[in-house]
Amino acid sequence: MTITVGDAVSETELENKSQNVVLSPKASASSDISTDVDKDTSSSWDDKSLLPTGEYIVDRNKPQTYLNSDDIEKVTESDIFPQKRLFSFLHSKKIPEVPQTDDERKIYPLFHTNIISNMFFWWVLPILRVGYKRTIQPNDLFKMDPRMSIETLYDDFEKNMIYYFEKTRKKYRKRHPEATEEEVMENAKLPKHTVLRALLFTFKKQYFMSIVFAILANCTSGFNPMITKRLIEFVEEKAIFHSMHVNKGIGYAIGACLMMFVNGLTFNHFFHTSQLTGVQAKSILTKAAMKKMFNASNYARHCFPNGKVTSFVTTDLARIEFALSFQPFLAGFPAILAICIVLLIVNLGPIALVGIGIFFGGFFISLFAFKLILGFRIAANIFTDARVTMMREVLNNIKMIKYYTWEDAYEKNIQDIRTKEISKVRKMQLSRNFLIAMAMSLPSIASLVTFLAMYKVNKGGRQPGNIFASLSLFQVLSLQMFFLPIAIGTGIDMIIGLGRLQSLLEAPEDDPNQMIEMKPSPGFDPKLALKMTHCSFEWEDYELNDAIEEAKGEAKDEGKKNKKKRKDTWGKPSASTNKAKRLDNMLKDRDGPEDLEKTSFRGFKDLNFDIKKGEFIMITGPIGTGKSSLLNAMAGSMRKTDGKVEVNGDLLMCGYPWIQNASVRDNIIFGSPFNKEKYDEVVRVCSLKADLDILPAGDMTEIGERGITLSGGQKARINLARSVYKKKDIYLFDDVLSAVDSRVGKHIMDECLTGMLANKTRILATHQLSLIERASRVIVLGTDGQVDIGTVDELKARNQTLINLLQFSSQNSEKEDEEQEAVVAGELGQLKYESEVKELTELKKKATEMSQTANSGKIVADGHTSSKEERAVNSISLKIYREYIKAAVGKWGFIALPLYAILVVGTTFCSLFSSVWLSYWTENKFKNRPPSFYMGLYSFFVFAAFIFMNGQFTILCAMGIMASKWLNLRAVKRILHTPMSYIDTTPLGRILNRFTKDTDSLDNELTESLRLMTSQFANIVGVCVMCIVYLPWFAIAIPFLLVIFVLIADHYQSSGREIKRLEAVQRSFVYNNLNEVLGGMDTIKAYRSQERFLAKSDFLINKMNEAGYLVVVLQRWVGIFLDMVAIAFALIITLLCVTRAFPISAASVGVLLTYVLQLPGLLNTILRAMTQTENDMNSAERLVTYATELPLEASYRKPEMTPPESWPSMGEIIFENVDFAYRPGLPIVLKNLNLNIKSGEKIGICGRTGAGKSTIMSALYRLNELTAGKILIDNVDISQLGLFDLRRKLAIIPQDPVLFRGTIRKNLDPFNERTDDELWDALVRGGAIAKDDLPEVKLQKPDENGTHGKMHKFHLDQAVEEEGSNFSLGERQLLALTRALVRQSKILILDEATSSVDYETDGKIQTRIVEEFGDCTILCIAHRLKTIVNYDRILVLEKGEVAEFDTPWTLFSQEDSIFRSMCSRSGIVENDFENRS
């Protein structure tokens, strides 16, 4: 947390700044207090650029101000392919050039073109021409208009949300005049649907125009049947009076076509404005979610873990975008309904009310169905969130899952969640499909009932004009009823999604007042940097807060019920009352005495100390005593319950290393201006020069997501360099030395902490007590919650905790080492500094030579690690459709597909022929048949169409759900078994996108698109066949109209498809950035870089919207031009009818016109469905790729090569001529490695950074396969075994222990293979629980509300937060040791496993390892050499080769050995060796 507390910022200014808050009652603490001249300036802009015209957006949108060159390249470049299209011969062969700069690009023309061009969207033609010749590039698109940029849109939305917040608070103050401001902020909750109202106000003009267009489109479609009636009556009269002039009929024909044209124009503009609103709303809410997470409190982040936020942005916002495009239809629905009712009554008389009654009956049935759909959607969302959260956790920790062979366990967990999710989705889809089938069949059923009633009332009154005009009106209502369920269904999704998002936006935030209160008081001693006076701090009790919120909810619900049932419950305690009593007891217990050693660390009480400017303070203590918490308390990140903290100067906390997916340089300067001299000095003092030299592109090498190309020590030093590069007054360092070896640690201490930062106030939490003498004073934290501060000598005299810790440290050796260095320095005389630099340079050169192969093996030659986002080009391959169909039908394909085709044909035939049969009935075609014959068959065709339609939708739904389920699960299975090299080089956001947005598309959108496409295609074919049957000459026009249709569709798809894919790629960048920001939230807030990352997000969202806006416009362009084709089609038909070119009856004309005048809608619908299907098939394509084509590791199980259960019984490991590379084609990392490790031997592995230490572990676990040679364990070649059989026999304690959200029990034994007694025993043996305390711990139970606050920290049922955030790093390492004990393996690998624990705990762990794994083979990679000096043998690696391999004493005895030199630098002397033989 970075804060600045000084006189330069007045309290008034701070309060004014805190007003600039979005979507929350509270301000962001981390960005309010600042006077630092070296602040993050990469997203800054001058006040003079804040013009009301929006021109400042252009300046803010310059990528070079806050994006590195790699970021710009990623979002502005993609591969170029020439297009080969059907009509390429009509265009010139010249390939258009790609604009290279923004100046060469045209601004989005929507507000900069004439009315005619806007009316027909002609301004999009340049993009279509380019897209027809080659693949569209990001720079081909129109650049963002400031009025449509996310910055402008979000500013408007923010103002509306603040207005609603203030309005809500004002109401609360009026109801509770005694309430304090803090109570108002906490309790004034927004009304439901506030976010929706804010969005509607943001887009009020735009959305109002959409509603106007929707009403106009509905009105024109409602009046068109009246022209149809006139046309039929004209044909009827013309058949009787042959001499009638045809001009009147031609006028009717042209009038009908003009009405169709107006309808198509308004319909397309309605969709354009509403879809545009959907795209913009999604962008706004994406930014709102990210900005909220920057301000969210710890409890809010507990309630909304990263996986849940990701689910909001990827899934819910996509549904909201889709829903907003249909909602204006609801506003236009009453108008068309009124028009149709009036015209039906005019045509048919009061009898029309019968059919209208059927419509209203169906509407009320649909309300019940909507309630069911709502319930299924809410239930499905719960499982979707759980699945996405688990997938995110799995992907973040996939290496750990591979180490522990937990792939099957997590695959099963995900499969179980997915099965439950699919169950709800299936029920929702079936309910929705029944509703759609009913809505589409309702007009036919209503017309059937109406005509039957009309016949009974008036047996002879069947005029063709009235009948078919009414049928057209019913068909218009059919179209409306088709869209109504979609509008309401998507509206339900939108309301649910916005409700979930509103709960996030209302979540509690960091208290900004805590930062303001840290300003020094008047009279503050200027010599002090920090002072604490009677301060108490505590971490939030998440479980208690959850219980309180639950009780509030129950009380609120019960209060509503009691209003209705007050008499029945009078005098009886309610459930909420009991809950409140239990909560009171919890709060009392919580404040009672407790043994901090046995429970979770909660906080500090009554802290009193001060720190002077320039002091170097060390904080130490046993693990779990709150060292990191004390730093957070100083930084203002921990909740203060009492006292006063005063900070005088800029303060920066350097916490757990977070590495951004960017170059090394960008990670170090982190948004500050680049100063080469300062940068080089920072790199030197942080001991990074040698590491940068070995990287292919030096400090411009892309590190890769999650720092995949770096060791733990390198990540720690880059994290340190980032903080040092910032110019601050007070530095808080959280164990920055734990991940580096003693030599590097000493260099950092000398050159950085006590060198470059010598004049700064430095506070270091550490276990490295060998350097404690360098501290001005030391703060020792005790297991009883006490804090003791003093000089080292003072504390040695009185503090038993420090005395115990020092007994395990190498302090005395360090003194000897310093004495030796003093002698050397004296001999060197005047060469002091120059000689040290030269020596360091030589050491770094050696390190460069030794580690070049190792590290370069992880990086491709140009310095990039992340693979480029895959973007398909041209049409979807048939293979994808084949794989999708295979997943959909399984073994029933020979039945399901033919049956579906039969049902589609049957539905179309019955639907169309019911109208034909109505014409037969109207003209009494079969003279000798009774009316019951016509009525019976008409009824049959109507109800058969309904039954066939239901069957068709049900089968398609079943197939779509099955395909989505199995493709997702197969992709999950494959990603769990893909090599680490793929995971390391693929951004997490991209992978997660496959299991969020792509999966959601298959669950909810693809089936709908396929249904639309198949049904509308069948309808169009049916209408064309009908026209040819009645008007044979029309067959001549069909090829010409087909060519025009294909011409338009081909031009559209050439660009529309590519721009949609481009939008998907740009969307992935937005999601990648969001995931990265969520993962590095603490670091970003500490460096006050929120604005920079929000600016980067704005840039990426704008790039996404440049494509997204065009996707919308292209759909409308093609819609209008297809309308023209359909109008030409209709004009030919109507002219053939009115001119009597063929002798057809008026009733037959009525049938033709009823369907021909629907053609514009049918053509638009099918093209939209085809396009949407192809877009959704892109999601299927990506999932199919993951499900079938991801690279796989070697066989997970080999039944024919399963070793005996007792293998390995000895633990002997032999490396024979082993060569190892991280990926095929990359340099060899381990070279010709030959080792023979005997059964039960304890091998210590050491070497400089990049020497290949951790690579041995990768080779043993076969994370990648050997390039040459073999590894034998108990004479079994491990390459012949299945990975499951190999890895489950190995145990590892990694450097970065991982905990999964859940309980300790699930983290130790996710398969439930062990008994509780075995797990308790492992916790005791691992040192997590004292043996004497075990009986008491076993008896502990959660309290009445299910909270675990009073239980032992390592109780099996103790809750584990996401990424184990409620456990310290040392505690997580104890649990990693316990995991290894649970596995009961014969071979144990320690990868710098005790780097983050104090020396006492380190000693205890080493002792337990010796005791518990005494008969096991141990390979220990360590930078604390003292932990391995008494191992059986030491392996020293250099350049991936064996440099030395012998007993520790033998190597130490050799004056020129590498091991001897390393021991000397670590202060290890002869007395440290127990075995000197």
Swiss-Prot record:
Any Gene Ontology CC annotation: cell periphery
InterPro entries, per the entry: AAA+_ATPase (IPR003593), ABC1_TM_dom (IPR011527), ABC1_TM_sf (IPR036640), ABC_transporter-like_ATP-bd (IPR003439), ABC_transporter-like_CS (IPR017871), ABC_transporter_C-like (IPR050173), P-loop_NTPase (IPR027417)
GO BP terms, alphabetized: transmembrane transport; xenobiotic transport
Position of sequence motif Diacidic ER export motif DxE: 71-73
Residue numbers on the Extracellular membrane side: 228-249, 350-357, 455-478, 637-892, 962-1027, 1139-1141
Topology relative to the membrane: Multi-pass membrane protein
Known glycosylation sites: 661, 759, 799
Biased amino acid composition, Basic and acidic residues: 36-48, 581-595
Domain ABC transmembrane type-1 span(s) in chain numbering: 207-493, 897-1175
Signal peptide coordinates: none
Transmembrane segments: 207-227, 250-270, 329-349, 358-370, 434-454, 479-499, 616-636, 893-913, 941-961, 1028-1048, 1118-1138, 1142-1162
GO MF terms held by the record: ABC-type cadmium transporter activity; ABC-type glutathione S-conjugate transporter activity; ABC-type xenobiotic transporter activity; ATP binding; ATP hydrolysis activity
Protein location: Cell membrane
Annotated positions of the Phosphothreonine modification: 53
Chemical reaction(s) catalysed: a 1,2-diacyl-sn-glycero-3-phosphoethanolamine(in) + ATP + H2O = a 1,2-diacyl-sn-glycero-3-phosphoethanolamine(out) + ADP + phosphate + H(+); Cd(2+)(in) + ATP + H2O = Cd(2+)(out) + ADP + phosphate + H(+); an S-substituted glutathione(in) + ATP + H2O = an S-substituted glutathione(out) + ADP + phosphate + H(+)
Induction: Transcriptionally regulated by PDR8.
Binding annotation for ATP 2: 1247-1254
Protein family: Belongs to the ABC transporter superfamily. ABCC family. Conjugate transporter (TC 3.A.1.208) subfamily.
Role, per record: Functions as a pleiotropic drug pump at the plasma membrane to clear toxic substances from the cytosol. Organic anion transporter involved in the detoxification of a wide range of toxic environmental organic anions that contain carboxyl groups. Required for tolerance to reveromycin A, tautomycin and leptomycin B. Required for oligomycin resistance. Required for rhodamine B resistance. Mediates the ATP-dependent efflux of rhodamine B. Involved in cadmium detoxification.
Record protein name field: Oligomycin resistance ATP-dependent permease YOR1
Species: Saccharomyces cerevisiae (strain ATCC 204508 / S288c) (Baker's yeast)
